[in-house]
Amino acid sequence: ETKELCSSKHSKVEGFPDLLSRGFEIVYMTGQQLEDIGFTQFIAHMAKEYLDSYGVQNAQIHWNQSHFSELFVDAWVNRYFEDNYTPPHNHAGNISGITILELPEESDLYDLRSLEFIWNNEHHRPEQVVGKTFLFDPQLMHWVTKQKCVSERRTFSFNLVVDIVR
């Protein structure tokens, strides 16, 4: 049932996107699913710390709605296998993020630094560790280089909206 609702390979939801025309499986999440697993509370705390570092004290944070269905929020799982990659892109919303869910055991330094950001002509390739969450400005150009490993690399990506309370 969840597979038929949420997976780009199996969904019966009309207009289910193939993000950036990558052609690999994407699993979209509903707000209720994120609430049920505790991710909404976790990311609200992280986003508050992120905003505090910019001097933003009074804000309400919520999920950006998906553009293709009212069922989903703008939060999805990417399932990368050998030769999968994500081209340079940016995001919608006010805060974007990536959580590393799974890394292949056979990952080498190339695969462990496959997530790349560019800022002021400087490239940043942070080391990926399972469980690590990266929050960033959605306009920050980033991409994932082609994976060399056969085993799965799984990430959770999301976009948040921030409403400043005055």
Question: Predicted regions span which residues?
Answer:
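Catalytic core of non-heme Fe(II) oxygenases with the double-stranded beta-helix
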Residues: S69-Q139, W143-T145, E152-T155, V161-V165
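Intrinsically disordered, low-complexity sequence elements enriched in Ser/Thr/Gly/Pro
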Residues: L20, S151-E152
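Non-heme Fe(II)/2-oxoglutarate
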Residues: E1-N64, Y85
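Flexible domain-boundary/linker segments
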Residues: Q60, K148-S151
